[in-house]
Amino acid sequence: MSPQELKARIASGLLSFPVTHFNADFSLNLPSYQKHVAWLSGYDAAALFAAGGTGELFSLTPQEIGEVTRAAKEAAGSVPIISGCGYGTELAKDIARRAEQAGADGLLLLPHYLMEVPQEGIYQHVKAVCDSTGLGVIVYNRSNSVANADTVARLADACPNLVGFKDGTGQTGLVRRITAKLGNRLSYIGGMPTHELFAQGFNGLGLSTYSSAVFNFVPELALRFYKALKAGDEATMAQILDSFFFPFADIRDREKGYAVSIIKAGVELIGHTPGPVRAPLTNLTPQEKDMLKALIANAGS
C-alpha cells in the first residue's frame, strides 16, 4: 500500500487497535491474537493498528513488535495493518524496518522515550524515522512529543510519506491550528483515551476519523456510535454515551493504566483469550470485571 493510499484509507472509516495477546507466563500468544484480529476484520474498520498503545507497544521488544505485526497482517485479510513504532530515534528506525519486513501497510509513530525536547528535536526525530522507511507514517501528538503547527508543516514538506496526524493531547486550539494550516495534506485522527467521549467536541476541528478502543470487544456498538457521529444523530450518541461510555469511563478511571487493562478485560469477557497485561500495568479486579461484564451485557440488549 502506497503512502497516499494509506492516507485515503485511514480517512475512510473507523480505526481500532487490537490488544496484544499473552500466555499466562507473559509470552506472546499469537494464535489467540490472530483469531481476535480475524474476528475484528469481519467488521467495518478502515484499518487496524498492531502493537499500538492499547496493544502494549511499550512492553514489547522490537522483535515482538515485528512478530505481532506479521501475525496481524496474516490474519486481517484485506484490512490494512499499521504497526506501532516509537522510543528513541535509532530504536524507532529499527522498529520501522522490522515492521516493513513484516508486511505492515504503515506506521504509527508514538512519542520518543521520556525526554522533553524542543520543536527542532521533534522535527529531527520524526524526519529520521520517515526517511528510514518507505511506509506511510502517522505522527502521534501526545505526552512529551507535541509538535506545533509549524513543525507539522515542516515535516509534511520534508517527508512525502508523512500522511497522517493523530492527536492524543486534547488541546483543541492546537488541533485546529494544525488542521487549518495543513488542510488536506494529511489525514487527521482523534486519539484521546476512549475518544468517543470527546468525539462530538472534536468533530468540528477538521478530524477525518478516530480510533476506538472498545471496538476490540463491542465492535457493533462502536460502529453505531461512529455512524451516528457522521450522520449528526445527537440522540443516538447521547443514548450510547449515557448507557455505555460514561459508566465504562467510571470503571476505567478507578486505576491508572486501566485505559489498556479494561480493553483486555472486555476482550476476555466476550470469549477470547487475550491473557494478562504485562507489568507495570495491572489487571482489573474480579469485582471490576463483573461491573464490566454487566455493562457489556446491557450494551447488547
From Swiss-Prot:
Recorded hits in Pfam families, A to Z, give:
DHDPS
Q: What UniProt keywords apply to this chain's record, in alphabetical order? A: Lyase
Which Gene3D superfamilies does this entry report, sorted A to Z?
Aldolase class I
State the InterPro entries in the record.
Answer: Aldolase_TIM (IPR013785), DapA-like (IPR002220), Dehydro-deoxyglucarate_dehyd (IPR017655)
**What cystine pairs are annotated?**
none
Top class in the EC scheme = lyase
UniProt entry tagged with the keyword Protein transport: no
Enzyme Commission number: 4.2.1.41
Q: Which domain of life is it from?
A: Bacteria
Single Gene Ontology BP annotation: D-glucarate catabolic process
Which pathway does the UniProt entry assign to this protein? Answer: Carbohydrate acid metabolism; D-glucarate degradation; 2,5-dioxopentanoate from D-glucarate: step 2/2
Q: Name one GO molecular function term.
A: 5-dehydro-4-deoxyglucarate dehydratase activity
The protein's annotated catalytic reaction(s) are: 5-dehydro-4-deoxy-D-glucarate + H(+) = 2,5-dioxopentanoate + CO2 + H2O
Supply the NCBIfam families for this chain. Answer: KdgD, PRK03620.1
Recorded family membership: Belongs to the DapA family.
| Name of this chain's protein | Probable 5-dehydro-4-deoxyglucarate dehydratase
Which organism is the protein's source?
Bordetella petrii (strain ATCC BAA-461 / DSM 12804 / CCUG 43448)
